[in-house]
Amino acid sequence: DDFQGSHWQPSLIPLKTWNKVGGFSEEFSPGLGSDPDFNMKLWNIGVRLFKGLGNCRVYHFSSLSLRKKAWNNGAKTFLLKWGISIKFFKKHYLRSDQVFNKILSEPKKNLNFYAGLFKCKIAYFYHSIFSK
């Protein structure tokens, strides 16, 4: 079944939208986190159609040309840039654990949302002070 969220890459978006968000961010290179960062930038300009195709194969070669370089910590970079974790973004914004049924709306602000947001803010505070 198709699902809410994204395969991360490949994505199909209009060139105008790519240019509006500035494509991939350099602070995530080389390494992890550029795909969720790109999706967050899309979310912030109002894109709400994130659909993963269930009946498709995606082959990812894990940056074969970059294997010998030191990778960034994409999860930490994402947290410090956006104030929330990739996991929180996938769960509450993209709703990646659900079958695709509609264009997404704003996250539901319930106890689960605020508890997760609180954890993100504690992690943000910790990393902004202790990991320079």
Predicted features and spans:
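Acidic donor-binding loop at a coil-to-helix junction in glycosyltransferase catalytic cores
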Residues: 31-37
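Loop/turn elements at helix/coil->beta-strand transitions in domains of secreted/extracellular proteins
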Residues: 46-48
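A recurrent flexible, glycine/aromatic-enriched loop bordering the glycosyltransferase active site
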Residues: 1-20
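Active-site donor/metal-binding and catalytic loop motifs
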Residues: 29, 51-70, 77
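Non-catalytic, C-terminal membrane-associated alpha-helical segments of glycosyltransferases
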Residues: 70-76, 80, 88-132
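Hydrophobic residues within well-ordered alpha-helices
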Residues: 42-43
